[in-house]
Regions:
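Broad phosphate/nucleotide-binding scaffolds in NTP-utilizing and phosphate-metabolizing enzymes
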Residues: 1-279, 286, 300-304, 310-318, ...
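Short amphipathic alpha-helical recognition elements used for nucleic-acid or partner binding
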Residues: 324-326
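Hydrophobic residue at the +6 position relative to the catalytic HRD Asp in the kinase catalytic loop
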Residues: 295-299
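Catalytic-loop of the protein kinase fold
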Residues: 284-294
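Short helix-adjacent coil turns
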Residues: 334-335
C-alpha cells in the first residue's frame, strides 16, 4: 500500500489553483476532443473523459479536504442517470476514493496519536496495528487493543487536514467550482443555488473535522440504540480520544465487498436494517446520520449491522422534524393538499414558487415510488436511476426542482436518498418498503420480523 508523508496543501490560493487550472484545461480539452470526433476520430470524447477522470480523481485523492469528501459523495450517485451521462467516467473513478485514499506513513500516524493524547502509544494501547484498516477523506483507522482487553478502532486525522478544510470552506468558490465542473461534465442544464448548497454541505463537513463533536454524536446514537436487537453503535473511549484522535469500541462484521457475496435473504435483512436506522433515527429522536456509504457499515452474519461513522450528523429542530415526517405521511396517504401545506411551512416555496398541490404531489409521489408501488420492491439500477432523475436531473425546464427552494435543513435528505438507493440496488434487496414506513410512523403494526423485534425492544 502506497503511503503519503507529504503535508496537506494549505491556504486558499494554494488549494484553489490546482482545481481551477485543471477545470480550465479540461474545458479546452473537451472542445478539442469534440472536434476530433466530428472529423472521424470515433470515441475521442469518451477517451478524453476517461483520461480526465483519472487525473481528477488523483487530484482529489491528495487534497485531504472538502473536495475529496464531495468526490466521495458523488461516487455513490448513478451518474449515467444524470443529464447525458457524461459524468459517468468520473463517477467510476471517484468510487476509488471510498477505500483507496493514500494513507499516512506509520511514523507520522504514531506521531499524531502521541502528540494529541500526550502519552506514548504503548501507555494507551496494549496492542496497536501500524497498518491502517481503512483510509478516508480526512483520516484513517487503525485497530488496537486497550489494556483491559477491549478491541477498539482508532481514527487518526491527517496532519493539516482540519486547517485545509477550513481554508476550503473560507474560499466559497472552491466547492462551487467543483459542482460546476460536475454539472458541465454531466451535460445537464441545471443551475442550482450553489451558494445554498455549499453553505449547508460546508456546515456538515466543518463538523467532520471536529473529532470531539463526532464523539458526542456517537454517544448520542449509542445511547439511543443501546441494547437494540439489530442496530449496533460503538462506544467512545474518552481517555483515548482527543482533538485529532477518536477511539471507539471495535464493531466486527463483514466489509462491503464481502457482504455483497452473502445469501440474498441476508442481504435483504441488512438493507432493511440500514433503512430502519436511516429513517428511524429522526423518528425516534431528532438525529439524522447524513453519510450513508458502504464503508460505514459492518455486516453481521446474524443480520445485524454496525454503524461506525458519525462525523456527518444533522440535528433537526423539533418543528422541522415533525413537519418533515408529516410531509412524508401526507405523500404516502395521498393527501396532496396537506403535503403542499407542509412543504410551504418547511420553506420549499420561499422563493414564490407556483408549484400547485397536484404538481407537488406528483413529484413527491414519484420520489416515494418504492413505498407506493405494489409490494415488495426489489431495488435495481433502475430504482437508483429513478431517484436521481426525480431529485437532480434537470433537463426538463418544467422539472419541479427548478420551481422550489430546498430549505437548508432538507439538503442532506437529498444526499440520503441518492446514496441509499444505490446501496440497496447493489445488495439487490427486496423489501416491504410501505409496511416499514407505516411501522416506523406508528400508522400500522409491524409485519416484518425486524419490525417485530424493534417493537418488542421499544
Amino acid at each position: 500500500m502506497a503511503v503519503n508523508d507529504n503535508p496537506v496543501p494549505r491556504g486558499r490560493i494554494r488549494r484553489s489553483m490546482p482545481l481551477a487550472g485543471f477545470t480550465a484545461r479540461a474545458a479546452g480539452g473537451r472542445m478539442v476532443a469534440a472536434l476530433r470526433e466530428k472529423t472521424g476520430d470515433a470515441g475521442a470524447v469518451t477517451r478524453f473523459h476517461e483520461r480526465t477522470a483519472e487525473r481528477y480523481t488523483e487530484l482529489l485523492g491528495h487534497s485531504k479536504g472538502v473536495l475529496m469528501k464531495a468526490g466521495q459523495v458523488l461516487s455513490m450517485v448513478d451518474a449515467s442517470a444524470i443529464g447525458n451521462g457524461g459524468f459517468s467516467p468520473y463517477q467510476k473513478a471517484l468510487a476509488r476514493l471510498q477505500a483507496d485514499a493514500p494513507p499516512m506513513d506509520p511514523a507520522l500516524a504514531k506521531d499524531v496519536l502521541q502528540t494529541d493524547l500526550g502519552r506514548p502509544v504503548r501507555e494507551v494501547f496494549a496492542e496497536f496495528s501500524a497498518e491502517p484498516m481503512a483510509a478516508a477523506s480526512i483520516g484513517q483507522v487503525h485497530r488496537a487493543v486497550l489494556p483491559d482487553g477491549r478491541e477498539v478502532a482508532v481514527k487518526i486525522q491527517y496532519p493539516g487536514a482540519a486547517q485545509a478544510i477550513r481554508d476550503d470552506l473560507a474560499n466559497t468558490e472552491l466547492l462551487a467550482t467543483f459542482f460546476r465542473f460536475v454539472v458541465s461534465a454531466s451535460g445537464t442544464a441545471m443551475q442550482p443555488d450553489f451558494r445554498q448548497m455549499t453553505r449547508e454541505i460546508g456546515a456538515r463537513i466543518a463538523e467532520e473535522i471536529d473529532y470531539r463533536h463526532e464523539a458526542a454524536n456517537i454517544t448520542a446514537f449509542s445511547e439511543l440504540y443501546r441494547g437494540h436487537p439489530f442496530i449496533r453503535v460503538p462506544d467512545v473511549i474518552a481517555e483515548a480520544s482527543g482533538d485529532r484522535v477518536l477511539t471507539m469500541t471495535y464493531l466486527d462484521g463483514l466489509d462491503w465487498t464481502a457482504a455483497q457475496r452473502a445469501d440474498q435473504e441476508l442481504k435483504n435483512t441488512w438493507a432493511e436494517v440500514i433503512g430502519r436506522f436511516s429513517a428511524g433515527s429522526y423518528r425516534h429522536a431528532n438525529l439524522f446520520n447524513a453519510d450513508p456509504h458502504p464503508g460505514n457499515y459492518r455486516f453481521g452474519l446474524d443480520g445485524t449491522v454496525g454503524f461506525v461513522d458519525f462525523g456527518c450528523v444533522k440535528v433537526l429542530p423539533e418543528r422541522v422534524r415533525l413537519k418533515f415526517i408529516e410531509m412524508i405521511r401526507a405523500t404516502i396517504d395521498g393527501r396532496k393538499y396537506d403535503l403542499h401545506d407542509r412543504m410551504a411551512e418547511l420553506g420549499y416555496f420561499a422563493g414564490g414558487s407556483t408549484l400547485s398541490a397536484d404538481e407537488a404531489y406528483e413529484w413527491m409521489a414519484g420520489l416515494a415510488y418504492e413505498a407506493l408501488a405494489p409490494q415488495p420492491i426489489t431495488f435495481t439500477r433502475d430504482t437508483a436511476e429513478r431517484a436521481v432523475r426525480g431529485l437532480i436531473d434537470l433537463r426538463s425546464p418544467d422539472h419541479p426542482v427548478r420551481r422550489v427552494s430546498a430549505p437548508d435543513d432538507m439538503v442532506f435528505f437529498t444526499r440520503l436518498s441518492l446514496m441509499l438507493n444505490p446501496i440497496y440496488a447493489m445488495l439487490g434487496a427486496t423489501c416491504y418498503v410501505r409496511s416499514i414506513i407505516d411501522d416506523l410512523d406508528g400508522a400500522a403494526e409491524p409485519t416484518t420480523p425486524l419490525g417485530k423485534q424493534h417493537d418488542a425492544w421499544v
